[in-house]
Amino acid sequence: MKVLVIGNGGREHALAWKAAQSPLVETVFVAPGNAGTALEPALQNVAIGVTDIPALLDFAQNEKVDLTIVGPEAPLVKGVVDTFRAAGLKIFGPTAGAAQLEGSKAFTKDFLARHNIPTAEYQNFTEVEPALAYLREKGAPIVIKADGLAAGKGVIVAMTLEEAEAAVRDMLAGNAFGDAGHRIVIEEFLDGEEASFIVMVDGEHVLPMATSQDHKRVGDKDTGPNTGGMGAYSPAPVVTDEVHQRTMERIIWPTVKGMAAEGNTYTGFLYAGLMIDKQGNPKVIEFNCRFGDPETQPIMLRMKSDLVELCLAACEGKLDEKTSEWDERASLGVVMAAGGYPGDYRTGDVIHGLPLEEVADGKVFHAGTKLADDEQVVTSGGRVLCVTALGHTVAEAQKRAYALMTDIHWDDCFCRKDIGWRAIEREQN
């Protein structure tokens, strides 16, 4: 069968690479893909943008694509799933209505409140003055979020009132995030440890994926501004069996049932960003209506199940007949980024030292890369590669991932040196 993966990041390289391992599959197309997917023998890039839904549909129909897997949020919010389904094509992802769980922070917070799903206390604002009054009433630390899609960067954790007020003015009056910031959510600062809890949903049944933990801040020891994610590992030891059960009972099931009850039946990957307190009680920080990036990369490296088989079962409402199998080992991925990210960065730098053949128990996933006219791999984004490895412990996986990137370099590249530090501290204690 033929599979189409929509997207061009590290997440899509990992999903397409995994899909191509299925015995059911003869070809995996990636639209538009990157240099990594271009160089994979089993994958084929297609020059169509992720939100060009008419062109994606034409391609899928002409090529007789049997299954489409959507990577990023933008096409989901624009209704790619609705369009493909209306044309009778199999596609795994939520409808535009269901994708509001990520497309609007205010929609999500109101939904959580309606269904008594644990989350931070909050209020929505469109005007500067009432927002500032609320800030002064609540004090700092406090969290300010742009309502719409801001590529994972529309969240400010303000440690002082001055910082909070500046963020509100930037978003509501200064247009810092364009349309995404025309409405903001202000919410209480939650203390605890974060985890990424990702599941597959078929509208009614849920199949949990392996747990993971992302590293959002750009600098070591979680300093500096938020990014799309600088590295991740799986599994996340903070998600004990008990926390896993609580998350399913208090968050995932009520969300799936609540969405269905409100007429937005959810199918696709559902990613709950959790904050877990000292007592092991999870609260929802955010929902994403897709797999996380960079979490996908270490999770796919551990996945033993057939991803395509699971997606097909989900499209048919038969996820309850499936289980997922994982490598017992831990995996860890480190993002190599362009100097200046998450601010302004340069593109077009040649990347040297990429491994020429497959690596045992490791993989270099490409994100912001493209093939230049002379077939050299050059940078084309802020997050450029995710260097990922397996190990019997998180510490071993970390050591292998950093060893794998020793020879890889380009002008002004950087990475965090401490990915996995929380899990490693746990292992050492």
Swiss-Prot record:
Positions of Mg(2+) binding: E286, N288
The keyword Calcium appears for this protein: no
Species of the source: Escherichia coli O6:H1 (strain CFT073 / ATCC 700928 / UPEC)
GO BP of this protein: 'de novo' IMP biosynthetic process; purine nucleobase biosynthetic process
InterPro entries: ATP-grasp, ATP_grasp_subdomain_1, PreATP-grasp_dom_sf, PRibGlycinamid_synth_ATP-grasp, PRibGlycinamide_synth, PRibGlycinamide_synth_C-dom, PRibGlycinamide_synth_C_sf, PRibGlycinamide_synth_CS
Highest taxon above the source species: Bacteria
Keywords, alphabetical: ATP-binding, Ligase, Magnesium, Manganese, Metal-binding, Nucleotide-binding, Purine biosynthesis
Domain ATP-grasp: 109-316
SMART domains to which the protein is assigned, alphabetical: GARS_A, GARS_C
Similarity comment text for this entry: Belongs to the GARS family.
GO molecular function: ATP binding; metal ion binding; phosphoribosylamine-glycine ligase activity
Necessary cofactors: Mg(2+); Mn(2+)
SUPFAM superfamilies given in the database record: Glutathione synthetase ATP-binding domain-like (SSF56059), PreATP-grasp domain (SSF52440), Rudiment single hybrid motif (SSF51246)
The protein's name in its UniProt record: Phosphoribosylamine--glycine ligase
A Pfam family annotated for this UniProt entry: GARS_N
Region feature Disordered, mapped onto this chain: 212-236
Subunit record text: Monomer.
